[in-house]
């Protein structure tokens, strides 16, 4: 998908389940921005503590995945090429610490200080 065609939450979840390798981070953030209000919040990801306002992309994606009861691999696919090209292709690198920690600790390592997303009502 590209940003030229706006996706719905259901479009994104369908793409995620049918063609996870085609999901792009920018599209995920666009869907989140379109359908949710975001409130910066701190969160733990394994031993890493992210302060409110830091690593907001990871915060949004992880909270969206939690709201939609996604599996660990579905959640990782939401990070798009950051996961596929940067993390999977370079397993010993140290970039994308939140993605790498989620690979290692999964949902057991995630704890939000408060709700980060609230679905918009029309």
Residue ranges and their predicted role:
Residues 18-40, 114:
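Short, charge-rich, low-complexity alpha-helical interaction segments
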Residues 47-97:
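Amphipathic protein-protein interaction modules
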Residues 1, 42-50:
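A ubiquitous short alpha-helical element
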Residues 94-122:
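Long, compositionally biased
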Residues 6, 10, 31-32, 58-61, ...:
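Intrinsically disordered, charged low-complexity linkers and terminal tails
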Residues 31-35, 78-82, 102:
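Short acidic/histidine-centered micro-motifs embedded in hydrophobic/aromatic stretches
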Residues 2-5, 10-15, 116-120:
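Long, charge-rich, low-complexity intrinsically disordered regions
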Residues 4-7, 23, 27, 94:
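Alpha-helix boundary/N-cap detector
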């Amino acid at each position: 998908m590209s940003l030229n065609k706006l996706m719905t939450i259901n479009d994104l979840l369908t793409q995620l389940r049918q063609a996870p390798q085609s999901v792009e981070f920018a599209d995920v953030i666009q869907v989140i921005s379109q359908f949710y209000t975001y409130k910066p919040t701190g969160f733990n990801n394994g031993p890493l503590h992210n302060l409110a306002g830091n690593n907001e992309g990871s915060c949004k994606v992880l909270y969206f995945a939690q709201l939609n009861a996604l599996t660990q691999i579905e959640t990782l696919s939401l990070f798009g090429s950051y996961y596929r090209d940067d993390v999977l292709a370079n397993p010993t690198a140290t970039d994308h610490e939140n993605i790498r920690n989620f690979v290692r600790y999964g949902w057991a390592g995630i704890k939000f200080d408060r709700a980060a997303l609230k679905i918009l009502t029309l």
